[in-house]
């Protein structure tokens, strides 16, 4: 019995010693107390936080929202800040988005920077105009088989001061949604049934943040309108994860609450007299609509403007009446659609094929100076790459190719 007591006692002593060693090491290795982050050399913008957090989160907790389309995953490369002091060495995960020259100048991804000590950083002044709003879902209707027009109502009297081509970030709490509960318009059920998508579920255990471009333009006030394409699992393996945010948005119904922040953006129109050519596909319609309505309705531009949109079939075309109306109102605007897979019931007599080929054959091939035009594009990565290759072959410089790379 005495040996048992002795063994238990020795074991307890060993455990206590190990705990003491760990606590001592933690006190030496992990910073204790508050950390101060000085922003733009302005004492009024200094924030105080606890060590051990990411810089992106520390700023957000202080009401300073840095753009992060991937929600802090390190994949979008948007949450750039300049770290003047503190922050440690740049990480390999950052070097995919930051050049060596930028790194030497202190450029970092705030989602990858651990706050361990007092820091000095620089942020663009426009960051301080970014806010959060608790909004109410106004409508959430299909405009194509896998795309919803998602409209949220801002609080009474509130506006998001965005520019055409800008985007907001939307937050999703932990959730478990079932695709069978989605409100999908009857005309689109065919593909959903055929691929078995109504059997899919999406379970997310952490908060998610994603970015979406506005489809409304600044004079459509009091709302934020998005075009959201759901990221389903591949039909041949429905066990793979579905898109976290898009699944959540598809589950929302009028009256539901949702939090957004913004405005963000850099996909803005240049203030020149050059001809403007817009090319879009899929949910890349959103910034196209925003830009085109802004140019024709608010700015009332006299520049020559055209819009080229690629869709799979007639069922995937949307905002047709909107653009027909703009074309009727403005002699300097025209728009074109090409269907890559028109269905027999479409009775389609318009252009067919991929939009970059149609753009070339119908317009750019005989254009006097395509290199003098400004090209604005947003669509699936394959479309973007094809258009960019076409423009490069035509001698268009990088400075005249503007890309909203939501799928990159």
Swiss-Prot record:
It is found in: Cell inner membrane. Keywords: 2Fe-2S, Cell inner membrane, Cell membrane, FAD, Flavoprotein, Ion transport, Iron, Iron-sulfur, Membrane, Metal-binding, NAD, Sodium, Sodium transport, Translocase, Transmembrane, Transmembrane helix, Transport, Ubiquinone. CDD domains: NADH_quinone_reductase. Its EC number is 7.2.1.1. [2Fe-2S] cluster binds at residues 70, 76, 79, 111. It comes from the Bacteria. The chain crosses the membrane at residues 4-24. Disulfide bonds: none annotated. It catalyses: a ubiquinone + n Na(+)(in) + NADH + H(+) = a ubiquinol + n Na(+)(out) + NAD(+). Residues 33-127 form the 2Fe-2S ferredoxin-type domain. Signal peptide: none annotated. SUPFAM superfamilies: 2Fe-2S ferredoxin-like, Ferredoxin reductase-like, C-terminal NADP-linked domain, Riboflavin synthase domain-like. It is a single-pass membrane protein. InterPro entries: 2Fe-2S_ferredoxin-like_sf (IPR036010), 2Fe-2S_ferredoxin-type (IPR001041), Beta-grasp_dom_sf (IPR012675), Cbr1-like_FAD-bd_dom (IPR008333), FAD-bd_FR_type (IPR017927), FNR_nucleotide-bd (IPR039261), NqrF (IPR010205), OxRdtase_FAD/NAD-bd (IPR001433). The keyword Magnesium does not apply. GO terms for biological process: sodium ion transport. It holds the Pfam family FAD_binding_6. Binds 1 [2Fe-2S] cluster. Residues 130-270 form the FAD-binding FR-type domain. One of its GO terms (molecular function) is electron transfer activity. HAMAP family: NqrF (MF_00430). Belongs to the NqrF family. Composed of six subunits; NqrA, NqrB, NqrC, NqrD, NqrE and NqrF. NQR complex catalyzes the reduction of ubiquinone-1 to ubiquinol by two successive reactions, coupled with the transport of Na(+) ions from the cytoplasm to the periplasm. The first step is catalyzed by NqrF, which accepts electrons from NADH and reduces ubiquinone-1 to ubisemiquinone by a one-electron transfer pathway. This is Na(+)-translocating NADH-quinone reductase subunit F. It comes from Idiomarina loihiensis (strain ATCC BAA-735 / DSM 15497 / L2-TR). The gene is nqrF.
């Amino acid at each position: 019995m005495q040996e048992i007591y002795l063994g238990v006692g020795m074991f307890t002593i060993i455990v206590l010693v190990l705990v003491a060693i760990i606590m001592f090491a933690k006190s030496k290795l992990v910073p204790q107390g508050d950390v101060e982050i000085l922003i733009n050399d302005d004492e009024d913008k200094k924030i105080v936080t606890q060590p051990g957090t990411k810089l992106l989160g520390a700023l957000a907790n202080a009401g300073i929202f840095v753009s992060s389309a991937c929600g802090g995953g390190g994949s979008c490369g948007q949450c750039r800040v300049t770290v003047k002091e503190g922050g440690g060495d740049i990480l390999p995960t950052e070097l995919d988005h930051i050049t060596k020259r930028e790194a030497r100048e202190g450029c970092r991804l705030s989602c990858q920077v651990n706050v361990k000590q007092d820091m000095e950083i620089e942020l663009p002044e426009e960051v301080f105009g970014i806010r959060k709003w608790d909004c109410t879902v106004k409508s959430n209707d299909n405009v194509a088989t896998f795309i919803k027009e998602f409209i949220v109502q801002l609080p009474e009297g509130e506006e998001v001061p965005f520019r055409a081509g800008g985007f907001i970030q939307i937050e999703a709490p932990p959730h478990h949604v079932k695709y069978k509960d989605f409100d999908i318009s009857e005309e689109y059920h065919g593909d959903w049934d055929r691929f078995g998508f109504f059997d899919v579920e999406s379970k997310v255990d952490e908060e998610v943040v994603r970015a979406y471009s506005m489809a409304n333009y600044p004079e459509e006030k009091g709302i934020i309108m998005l075009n959201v394409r759901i990221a389903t699992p591949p039909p041949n393996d429905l066990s793979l994860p579905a898109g976290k945010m898009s699944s959540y948005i598809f589950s929302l119904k009028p009256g539901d609450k949702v939090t957004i922040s913004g405005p963000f953006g850099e996909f803005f129109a240049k203030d020149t007299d050059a001809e403007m050519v817009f090319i879009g596909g899929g949910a890349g319609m959103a910034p196209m609509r925003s830009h085109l309505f802004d140019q024709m309705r608010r700015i009332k531009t006299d520049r020559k403007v055209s819009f080229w949109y690629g869709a799979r079939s007639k069922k995937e075309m949307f905002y047709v009446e909107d653009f027909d109306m703009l074309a009727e109102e403005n002699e300097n605007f025209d728009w074109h659609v090409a269907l890559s897979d028109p269905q027999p019931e479409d009775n389609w007599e318009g252009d067919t094929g991929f939009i970059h080929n149609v753009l070339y054959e119908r317009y750019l091939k005989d254009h006097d100076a395509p290199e003098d035009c400004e090209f604005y594009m947003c669509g699936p990565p394959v479309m973007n790459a094809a258009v960019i290759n076409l423009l490069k072959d035509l001698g268009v410089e990088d400075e005249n190719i503007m890309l909203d790379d939501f799928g990159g």
